[in-house]
Amino acid sequence: MNAPQTNDTAADVATIEASAAEVGRRALTRREQKEAYEDNKLFKRIVRQVGQAIGDYNMIEDGDKVMVCLSGGKDSYAMLDILLRLRERAPIDFDIVAVNLDQKQPGFPEHVLPEYLTQIGVPFHIENQDTYSIVKRLVPEGKTTCSLCSRLRRGILYRVAGELGATKIALGHHRDDIVQTLLLNMFYGGKLKGMPPKLQSDDGKNVVIRPLAYVKETDLEKYAELREFPIIPCNLCGSQPNLKRAEMKALIREWDKRFPGRVDNMFNALANVVPSHLMDTTLFPFASLRATGQADPQGDIAFDEEPCASGDETAAPGGAKPISIVQFDDL
């Protein structure tokens, strides 16, 4: 009777295991390569969109001091991160200072932002103002705090900008925020009013910019996860149920899933306005309109059916072209 070939069997098992491990490593490598490729695409897309928005609206000029409002959320972290990267390659010189308004919310981790900003070497200022107590005292239980909180915060940030000598105030609102604001004003305010990428502040002393205006929120979520920003949750507004803005956010997310391109077209429509085909008499002189006997390209022909967008278009509002603030091939 032959003895069992224990050594040969063990060797065969070891070979099979080694082969399986190698296959697993190759599969992991391919997956990692794909993830790295997608991450790089995401980064380049956000950089391109931010650079394009800055160029389209002349948000940042040579010699500017940009006050980046940093809340500790994903949007403001991403805005600061991208602006720092753009500044490295920009053909102009501008300074960046990060500002956080500590509103004295219970449990707010005061150490997170100073540690992060010190680590990445960005000048910063922490403004301590107990707006939390004011909001809680003045707003009835169950009512939204957003309106009062934003007014208080806005006034403080305008003052701080003046004290720091900032020429631009950068806020982290993105594409979805802008469309949400449009829908809110239409549904609840009876206005065609959105959230502009650039505006003069209420006091007339500051210019507010929104560099993330062209960026989708889902991209910012992925980017924040990729960069591992130390996110700080907001206890004032994010935890409140039944907010109208939350309803608009859910609606936009649903449209993005079911009807690709719909939200993009709504966003692009904000930069393709035809006042003669609306109803605002302050924008178009309807009362004095008379037949001139000359053909008008914006007349009846405007009611003809136009080709619908496919949803694949990636152009910015108004068909604007990217600016040359950064050489994207070098990223």
UniProtKB/Swiss-Prot annotation:
GO-annotated molecular function: 4 iron, 4 sulfur cluster binding; ATP binding; magnesium ion binding; sulfurtransferase activity; tRNA binding
Motif (PP-loop motif): 71-76
Pathway the protein takes part in: tRNA modification
Keyword annotations from UniProtKB, A to Z: 4Fe-4S, ATP-binding, Cytoplasm, Iron, Iron-sulfur, Magnesium, Metal-binding, Nucleotide-binding, RNA-binding, Transferase, tRNA processing, tRNA-binding
Cofactor note text: Binds 1 [4Fe-4S] cluster per subunit. The cluster is chelated by three Cys residues, the fourth Fe has a free coordination site that may bind a sulfur atom transferred from the persulfide of IscS.
GO biological process: tRNA thio-modification
Top EC category: transferase
The enzyme's E.C. designation: 2.8.1.-
The organism's place on the tree of life at top rank: Bacteria
Biological role: Catalyzes the ATP-dependent 2-thiolation of cytidine in position 32 of tRNA, to form 2-thiocytidine (s(2)C32). The sulfur atoms are provided by the cysteine/cysteine desulfurase (IscS) system.
Leftover remarks: The thiolation reaction likely consists of two steps: a first activation step by ATP to form an adenylated intermediate of the target base of tRNA, and a second nucleophilic substitution step of the sulfur (S) atom supplied by the hydrosulfide attached to the Fe-S cluster.
Subunit structure: Homodimer.
Name used for this protein in its record: tRNA-cytidine(32) 2-sulfurtransferase
Source organism of the structure: Burkholderia multivorans (strain ATCC 17616 / 249)
Name of the gene encoding the protein in the UniProt record: ttcA
